[in-house]
């Protein structure tokens, strides 16, 4: 998070997502004395990737604090807020979802958070991933490649990145990645647990800010061609530097 001050000296803590490339979670948890705050499934996990992992547990929003506020106080409040949002959404979730625990829903919500910033698309993205999981299909979502690459990501995904088997690359692993890959908003958590009524299995960017959702690989491939055409057209209209 970032700490800002207004002209009255009031601190404003702004929590932002930096893609989670700093993985010294245990050290951070110890330094900020967060061990007693985090849930047992994280602290006591036998999976070294999950153990002490802080990703996803803090609700992204703007919070206001006065002088003397500590990092631990701020993060405790953010954690409690995320727990409240997740618990309420989980208790009111739609039936027959493929998620066994609230933590799995948090993981999915973080992926939706990274896939689209268009509010009305979140339930559709959620439906695509639910449908793929229900059918035993791999999720094949690019943000998981990027997260698994960490600091090696330089702005482009290459074929070798798609083919690399990391713990997060959902082109190479079945099901969900082991932890969240971002800080999911309440809207993404809600979309995860209330997906749209859709049979879509694929989506691709349109080149104009949104995505096109399709039910078959043939239709998806056509949508990809259309996207590439839009991008070529935009590139041709860009004046030389």
Report the location of each language-model feature.
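Bacterial extracytoplasmic/cell-wall-associated proteins, especially those involved in peptidoglycan
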Residues: 3-16, 20, 25-241
């Amino acid at each position: 998070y970032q700490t800002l001050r207004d002209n009255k000296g009031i601190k404003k803590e702004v929590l932002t997502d930096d893609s989670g490339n700093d993985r010294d979670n245990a050290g951070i948890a110890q330094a900020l004395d967060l061990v007693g705050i985090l849930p047992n499934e994280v602290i006591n996990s036998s999976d070294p990737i999950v153990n002490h992992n802080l990703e996803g547990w803090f609700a992204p929003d703007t919070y206001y604090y006065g002088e003397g506020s500590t990092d631990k106080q701020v993060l405790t409040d953010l954690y409690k807020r995320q727990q409240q949002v997740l618990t309420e959404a989980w208790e009111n979730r739609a039936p027959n979802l493929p998620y066994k625990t609230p933590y799995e829903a948090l993981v999915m919500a973080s992926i939706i958070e990274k896939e689209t910033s268009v509010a009305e698309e979140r339930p559709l993205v959620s439906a695509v991933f639910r449908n793929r999981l229900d059918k035993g299909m791999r999720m094949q979502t690019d943000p998981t490649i990027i997260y698994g690459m960490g600091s090696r990501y330089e702005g482009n995904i290459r074929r070798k990145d798609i083919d690399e088997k990391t713990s997060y690359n959902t082109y190479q692993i079945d099901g969900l990645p082991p932890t969240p890959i971002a800080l999911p908003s309440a809207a993404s958590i809600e979309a995860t647990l209330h997906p749209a009524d859709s049979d879509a299995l694929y989506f691709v960017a349109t080149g104009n800010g949104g995505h096109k959702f399709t039910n078959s690989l043939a239709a998806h491939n056509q949508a990809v061609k259309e996207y590439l055409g839009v991008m070529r057209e935009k590139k041709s209209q860009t004046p030389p530097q």
